[in-house]
Regions:
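Conserved ABC ATPase signature
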Residues: 200-204, 208
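H-loop/switch region of ABC-family ATPase nucleotide-binding domains
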Residues: 32-34, 260-262
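Catalytic Walker B motif of ABC-type/P-loop ATPase nucleotide-binding domains
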Residues: 1-2, 225-229
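Conserved ABC transporter NBD signature motif
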Residues: 128-146
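Conserved ABC ATPase "signature" region
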Residues: 179-196, 215
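ABC-family nucleotide-binding domains
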Residues: 8, 235
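Helix-to-loop junction immediately C-terminal to a conserved catalytic motif
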Residues: 124
Length: 290
């Protein structure tokens, strides 16, 4: 069930090769995923589930594996990292001398274990670090004031919710963007969630919970939203909807985003900047394709 949602490309390919080897030794493998193109060189059969019916796909198509994640050259910064060192146990995970992150939509990539989630937690003061982080030239400190400016979308939607009832969760929102109500109504209608708001989140699918989580976070008035694997459990239509909302927030409200994702297709030609974590530090990637 979406086995590679949080797995980097290199590791994913190694695991797929292992699965194929198991298959060659007589093990039947059934995979449920929103990215069928990952399995074109491995799977024998593709089926599509829609409205309670299974349909055999006779000609699964391949998508362009290359995505463009850097589409902007503006220089207005939102974050500056100065002499940052982050430890994971006794291991130094990140060491950054001086690095700027710009306003807009930034995609943050890197292999598993390189520190992507840890960096987001450091920015939001949920992880200890040495050094200084500046937000709009003001040193970041853990405070209530900070969380009115920076918010974080956690990987596990359940960890984000205060209430188990979606209607209650939505009603708790106070300071939201003027255009957010319209987008909330659109999301609930397009994904058939209008009649589900009084059901416990325990009865929601992973994708439905993720949509409610993102709906609440994208509605809130914050200058910077940190998104950790926001496309997990979402189908292509849902990913496109969320990216349209993100772009609308950027256009109408000037909101900025740092998005950690191993699923890059939704960000193709929509991401302004691409930052990669490798060799324990940060790098701006300016090539057209990734």
């Amino acid at each position: 069930d979406e086995p590679f949602a949080n797995v980097d490309k290199k590791t994913r390919n190694s695991l797929l090769a292992l699965l194929k080897d198991l298959n060659n030794h007589g093990v039947t493998i059934i995979v449920c995923d929103h990215e069928p193109h990952l399995y074109l060189n491995y799977a024998d059969t593709f089926t599509y589930l829609s409205d309670g019916n299974l349909e055999l796909v006779t000609d699964p198509t391949s998508k362009n594996p290359n995505v463009k994640l850097c589409n902007n050259t503006q220089s207005e910064q939102i974050l500056r990292l100065e002499n940052i060192s982050i430890q994971q146990g006794k291991k130094e995970l990140l060491n950054v001398d001086d690095f700027h992150i710009f306003k807009g939509i930034t995609t943050l990539t890197g292999d598993n274990g390189t520190g992507k989630t840890t960096l987001l937690h450091a920015i939001s003061q949920l992880k200890k670090y040495d050094g200084k982080i500046y937000f709009n030239e003001e040193k970041v400190k853990k405070s209530r004031k900070l969380y009115k400016k920076i918010s974080t979308c956690l990987q596990d939607a359940f960890q984000q919710f205060i209430s188990l009832m979606p209607r209650e969760e939505i009603s708790m929102q106070k300071d939201i963007w003027e255009h957010a109500t319209l987008w909330q109504e659109r999301l609930l209608k397009e994904f058939d969630l209008e009649k589900e708001l009084d059901k416990s989140l325990y009865y929601y699918s992973g994708g439905q919970r993720k949509l409610i989580q993102l709906m609440c976070l994208l509605s809130q008035k914050t200058e910077l939203l940190l998104l950790d694997e926001p496309f997990t459990h979402l189908d292509e239509r849902a990913c496109s909807f969320i990216m349209e909302w993100i772009e609308e927030n950027k256009r109408l409200a000037g909101q900025s985003f740092i998005i950690v994702s191993h699923r890059l297709e939704p960000l193709n030609n929509r991401s302004d900047y691409h930052i990669e974590i490798s060799n324990n530090t940060l790098h701006h990637i300016k090539g057209d394709n990734y």
